[in-house]
Amino acid sequence: DEIFPHESGNVGFLSQSGSHAFRVITRGGARGLRFSKVISYGNAMDLNEADLLTHFAEDPDTEVIAAYIEGVRDGRRFFEALRLAAARKPVVILKGGRTAAGRTAAASHTAALASEQAVWQAAVRQAGALEVSSLNELVDMVVALTLAGPAKGSSVGVLGGAGGDSVETADICHEAGLDVAPLPQDLREALREKLPHTWDWIGNPVDGSILGWGRFEALEVTQLMAANPAYDLVLINARSLEHMLNQEDGEKLFGEAIDILKNLGKESGKAIMVVMGEPEFRDERRWKAAMDAREGLAAAGVAIYSDIGTAARAMGRYVRYTAKRQERAASAASA
């Protein structure tokens, strides 16, 4: 089918719902995810969640595991399979039937016996997997784990948009557990040489309106932040770049800016997330340019998100989950 990606990839997804399997493929595929296998196992009369988790743990083509589960057949066997899988690879799980209403729906959907939420959460946490609360959040976290790049800490450099957007972005990032660190002195000195008229106004997040709408300066500052060891992560609100399209040669400038974003993660070796949702401009020319850019970023393997809040929360959880996995691996190695 044309709506499915044709290339294989490194994400394995097991789902107790065929419709959820379809949505993860289409939503994830549009954001650059590619799959080793997607398995919809329904009422688990033959193969169940423990069998499939064990398979994905041992599958050389699968590097990240995602799961939608409504109920488990054998709690002890499921926990052992989940612990095995999470020790080897990142595992993201969405539980169906977390509430009384959900448990009733799960019973009629797949005859699953949905477990009590507190017991489930404790088991998932102890096994080392990452629990999410919606299908969109599952896709967000798999995008982070698969495409964002290495997360070595929580210090983030941000291209935050303009004015109030920058202020709101700083708040959202802080609330997500990220450290919006001030510009270090060596970076400020570099800005003094590059932007002598505005350097002292520039901070983190970078306020694009200070540097002028539709200009490259904000992106150049972001490149400097990505190259600076003071920052572990970079979060880019690419919506501010859409203003380049207002200029006479806007499509060319905008295309060049998007090309820089495509390569920023590879060049910096850091975790990069780009915010590029639906364009705020509604005329056909600018709408098409922005949507083409979004598709191009996804095709280039860039972790893209629809809004700053979603990206910041995903980045915060990604950093914490990666750190916990590293702690577990170190503890296991020293045992």
Predicted features and spans:
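Catalytic-core regions of core metabolic enzymes
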Residues: 1-335
